[in-house]
Amino acid sequence: MWNGLTDDYHPTQILADFLTLQEHFGRLRGLKFVYVGDGRNNMANSLMIGAAKMGMDFVLDAPSQLWPSEELVQLCHSYAAESGGSITITDQPDAVEGADVIYTDVWCSMGEEDKAAERVKLLRPYQVNRELMERTGKKETVFLHCLPAVKGNEVTEDVFESPASLVFDEAENRMHTIKAVMVATLGRQE
């Protein structure tokens, strides 16, 4: 059985994300990976786990009302201690400083449409826009999003369509990584 997506986790997406970063940077270990937005959704949970296991410096920048469970954070701290990575949970705008990667996801997950207006108001300060990208202090910072994106909410069109955006490479890599999972798990090839 494969977990393609649940309310809590999205592991196959993380494989595509990390392949995209490996292709772009040539490494994962030591990258500063900042997730901005709803910090308790399936993408934030899975990215934090994956980044912790791969030795990345993971920063979750979200309003405290949308932080992940303390149990998951502690588990990820233990993974990071083993891999040489780190986990930081914050609500501060300067969290993006020095980021190699900025990642966001939709502000209103599937099944939460009734909370859309409240989420937009709460998360507006966490929008990935040109100003946020400039606050990284790096011209080489890349942008990722698992798609589909609501341009104008979690990310502005100018960032989404910019050279920093690797979202289409990331989307293509979903096909390759999911095929790899299938080949690796469907049984022995004769």
Where are these regions (language model features)?
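General beta-strand structural signal in soluble alpha/beta enzymes
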Residues: 1-4, 10, 35, 144, ...
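Phosphate/diphosphate ligand-binding glycine-rich loop within oxidoreductases
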Residues: 1-22, 151
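Short, acidic/turn-prone active-site loops that include or flank metal/cofactor-
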Residues: 5-9, 63-66, 171-174
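Short, charged, surface-exposed secondary-structure boundary motifs
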Residues: 10-15, 69-71, 176-180
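Glycine-rich phosphate/diphosphate-binding loop of Rossmann-like nucleotide-binding domains
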Residues: 23-104
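Rossmann-like adenosine-cofactor binding region
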Residues: 77-157
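Adenosine-phosphate binding glycine-rich loop
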Residues: 140-141, 146-190
